[in-house]
Amino acid sequence: VTASGPTGADPSCPDAAFWCGPARVSELIESVGEDPGPGPHLWYVHATTPHIPWIYTPEGQQYLPRGLDALAIDGLGRDNAWTEDISAVRQAFQRHLLQVGAVDRLVGQLIDEMEDDGTWDDALVVLVADHGVAFSPGLPARAPSPTTNAEIYNVPLFIKAPGQVDGRIDRDN
């Protein structure tokens, strides 16, 4: 099995990895259809989106400037806990949802490209996140608690098996 994936050496992404997430997925999409040579092949990408600072629109446009100022999320303290200000927490949640929209668009582009190339039907495709985030005023965004467990541990897992036609949703986790 040979493997390939974006190298992360993109000069347009000099900052932390979260600035590069959409670019890395786009690079993977562009590689669909390239001849990997004989035998099985693994394409992979580690994309850090959606992730703080939640800076992308569903169209993939960055709406905040690069730099440390963009890392600040109103309502989220340095201790990674939310303020009691529900408006600030709701705004952060909306920013998160915008970036989820960007991820959804990229996944759709990947599927479309694989279908157009004829690789979708025979492919095993796995998409997974490593953690969620809680948007509960006054509580930590990432530290599990009885109040935040459902948000933090509710992570997406998408598996498309080779030859699979019908999908299903399984919420038993």
Outline where the language-model segments fall.
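Catalytic domains that recognize anionic headgroups
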Residues: 1-173
